[in-house]
Each structure stands twice: as C-alpha cells, then as structure tokens.
Amino acid sequence: MTHCINGQWLAGEGETVIKTDPVSGEVLWQGRGASAAQVAAACEAARGAFPAWARQPFAERQAIVEKFAALLDTNRVELSEAIARETGKPRWETQTEVQAMINKVAISLRAWHVRCPEQVEGESSVRHRPHGVMAVFGPYNFPGHLPNGHIVPALLAGNCVLFKPSELTPLTAEIAMRLWNHAGLPQGVLHLLQGGRETGQALVQQPQVDGILFTGSAATGYQLHRQLAGQPEKMLALEMGGNNALIVEDPDDIDAAVHIAIQSAFISAGQRCTCARRLLVRRGAAGDAFLARLAAVAATIRVGRWNDEPQPFMGSVISPQAAEKIYAEWQARIDAGGNVLLPMCWPERSSALLTPGIIDVTEVRDLPDEEIFGPLLQVMRYDDFTHAIQLANDTRYGLACGLISPQREKFDRLLVEARAGIVNWNKPLTGAASTAPFGGVGASGNHRPSAWYAADYCAWPMASLASADLSLPDTLSPGLDFSVNKEAE
C-alpha cells in the first residue's frame, strides 16, 4: 500500500512511481501516486481532525512526538539503511541523519517554548494558535531529517499535516509514517501522499490547505509562490538552496583549510543546500599552493556505494539522470574556457556515481548564476578582500557564505557585508545547527527560516486585552456623557 490517508493504508490511483537504487538500478519501491480525489479526501480528513487535535493539551501532543523520537531510536538501523539505499549516501551519513531526526524533537520543544510562549503582562496577553492544515513538501537529499524539521513543530503547534515526500525517496517516507502511527497520533492528524508533480499540484490547489512548507529547488519554489499569488491568508515557507561562496584568505594551516573546503563542497556528493558552489581564492603564490593541495587531497576522496567497505566519504547523487545534468554542467564550463584543476569522472552512464570536479572559472564570461546540486566546485580568484565580498554577493541567492582565515577582523567585516542567512568562519558551510535559524535571502527563500525558527511559521500570534471587571472607567473620553437620563432611571 502506497498512501496513508485518515489512518488507512491505500493503493494509489495516480501516476506510476518507481524508485530504483541510484547505482545498481535495482527497484526499491513502486506504486502509484495519490490522485486528485485521494488528495482531496486526505485534506477533508485533516480538516475534520484539526479541531480536536488543536484543543488537545500541549503535554499530550508532546508525549506523542517524544514517543516518535523513541521509535526512531529503536528503528534507527532500518531507517538509516533505507535512506542510504534510496539516496546513495554512505551509512555513516545516514546514521547521522537519523540521529538528527531524533534530536529534532527535543530541539523543537525548546524552540516552541522560546519562540511561542504564552505571555501575560497585566491585562495584556499573547498566545499562539495553529494555522490548521499544513502541507509539507519533502526533498530527496535529507528525506528523513528535513521533512521532520517541518512536521514535528507543526504537530506540536496543533496543526494537522499532509506530507508529500519526494518521489525519489518514497521508502524513507513510508517508514517514518509507520513510526508516527505507532507513536499514537490520532486518526487524520498526519497523512502520507506519495507521488510526483501531479500529486503535488493537486495538493497545492486544495482550498483546505492553510499553509505550505517547502524545501527544494528555486524553480519549484518560485512556481509555488506564483500559484499562491492572491492568497495572503495561506502560510508559505520556502527554502530554496543557494549558489554559496566560500572565501579562502591566507589560511595559516593549509590542510585544515582544505578539509573545510572538502567538507563544504563534496559531503553528500554536493547535495546539501549549503554546499559551497563557488570557492573564492586570493590571487598569488599562496592561493596557488592552496588549490594544488586541495586538488591533490580531493583526488583521493573515496567514492562508492552506500554499503561499500571500507566506507566511502562520498556516495552517489540521487539518480543517473541527475548525474547526467551535473556532468553536462561540468562539460559546459570546460567548453566556456574553464581551467580544470581536478577532472570530474562519470565512470558508468547507468550509475549515479560521480567523482568530485574542481574547475577554475575566473575567466569564464556569463557564468550562469544557478545552483548545481552535485560535486562540482567552481574556483574564482580575487584581488583583495573587498573584491572577494563583491564576488560572494554577486548572486541572486543568499543562503550561505563562509570565510577561512586567521583574521577575526575579516570575519567581522563579512558579518556586516555578506548577503546570506548563514555566515561561518573557519567552519564548513554545511555545518548548520538546529539550534539556530536556517534560511536565506534573495532566491534562497521568502524570509521564513526553518530549524530553530520553524515554530514561527507553524503558529500565529493572538494578542488579547482582558479584564474580569466590567465597569465604566474613572475618566471618560471627551465628548461622552453617561449622566443623561440617569435620574429618570
């Protein structure tokens, strides 16, 4: 059975979905997507379940979410292996992802009490109310952790949720849904709707949906924004990636700097929203030495299948089709005059395994300002730090920016001048924390950061003035007279 609608597992009635191993081509999951009628039924059930769920005491909602975290812990081996098989990521990475899912529960609880506490000051009070029915669109790069970062705070706030995972990671979503059911969620509170574009379109068009929480490409995010134009009553939270820059400024430990660059560019085969896409290196002998060392170390990165032993640092990208697009972007930069520092290889066209590629594009004209979601690192040389900041900000995106440098004053300047939601110093760009907001500006989002700030878009504030005493004020406003006909009464 493909979908979980109103507590029942059902076969789909929509388009056929087949998920294969990114490397071997083995079929891992198959079914049919949710039809428009099934999406409508799920929305209706969620709307019906919402009043009781929203009124349920917070402590009871918390207990269910904490039970889910305990079930994640118990089932971590099965879930981490499913993520690895679907995404191609090595085991060590997917085990870390499941741990992040577990940690998200306690973090979301703390965030709720910090971001959305009930406040009373005299006759004034503030409390927070859930939106209603929220649609969560999950990405494929972190198919467990990233949807979890929307679902957990949404449920804690008292919302009902319609979860549409990526069609490239249906198995992970199915396992997570079964764990939620075992945790004791009331019927109708959380629904799983598998499928591709048709299912997603049907979900967005549902009038019962009060908000959409999305993580994915800028193209899809912009499409969602256009579709919801003229509907300001609906919450829309978009996280859309970036063309992120990492600046290298005279590091005093070249190997440490190289390690940060590799972690920033090639972890998860370059399939993290905050991965470095552009590496900015000062012109001169020191910059040349850094790049030579980077290319030499990156050439030794072990690339392999999710279950290879010894474990690889980098697995495959999500599909052979994705590998083809990434490799085409690599070739396009060579054709445009880029200088290859480390050649990207695609050994088997039927496989999604790529090796890291590094190319100097300093002299390439009209370089596309796009997020290449894979292990392709573009080097740009700069003259001075002012030039470096100009290059870093020369993008329509604004998710992440980083600096490798021993000079604190350079980082202080970057904090003021960088146009990015995440700005790191001597840390990988991919080192985001759930205890901080996660999001960007420009084409990277719509000012609805997730992680620690997810509670903000899962509930709306209600302000109240209240008094138990009903009486006239001691002093009336000018022009009012309550003495008229008083004696006659």
Swiss-Prot record:
Signal peptide per UniProt: none
Keyword NAD: yes
EC number(s) given by UniProt: 1.2.1.71
PROSITE patterns, per database record: ALDEHYDE_DEHYDR_CYS, ALDEHYDE_DEHYDR_GLU
Gene3D superfamilies xrefs: Aldehyde Dehydrogenase, Chain A, domain 1, Aldehyde Dehydrogenase, Chain A, domain 2
Catalytic residue list: E239, C273
Coiled coil: none
Keyword NAD attached: yes
Molecular-function GO terms, alphabetical: succinylglutamate-semialdehyde dehydrogenase activity
Pathway where this protein functions: Amino-acid degradation; L-arginine degradation via AST pathway; L-glutamate and succinate from L-arginine: step 4/5
UniProt: NAD(+) binding residues: G216, S217, A218, A219, T220, G221
Matches recorded under InterPro entries: Ald_DH/histidinol_DH (IPR016161), Ald_DH_C (IPR016163), Ald_DH_CS_CYS (IPR016160), Ald_DH_CS_GLU (IPR029510), Ald_DH_N (IPR016162), Aldehyde_DH_dom (IPR015590), SuccinylGlu_semiald_DH_AstD (IPR017649)
GO biological process: arginine catabolic process to glutamate; arginine catabolic process to succinate
Xref: SUPFAM superfamilies: ALDH-like
Pfam families linked: Aldedh
Keywords: Arginine metabolism, NAD, Oxidoreductase
Catalysis performed (reactions): N-succinyl-L-glutamate 5-semialdehyde + NAD(+) + H2O = N-succinyl-L-glutamate + NADH + 2 H(+)
Function: Catalyzes the NAD-dependent reduction of succinylglutamate semialdehyde into succinylglutamate.
Family, per entry: Belongs to the aldehyde dehydrogenase family. AstD subfamily.
Classification via PANTHER family: ALDEHYDE DEHYDROGENASE-RELATED
Name of this chain's protein: N-succinylglutamate 5-semialdehyde dehydrogenase
Taxonomic source organism: Erwinia tasmaniensis (strain DSM 17950 / CFBP 7177 / CIP 109463 / NCPPB 4357 / Et1/99)
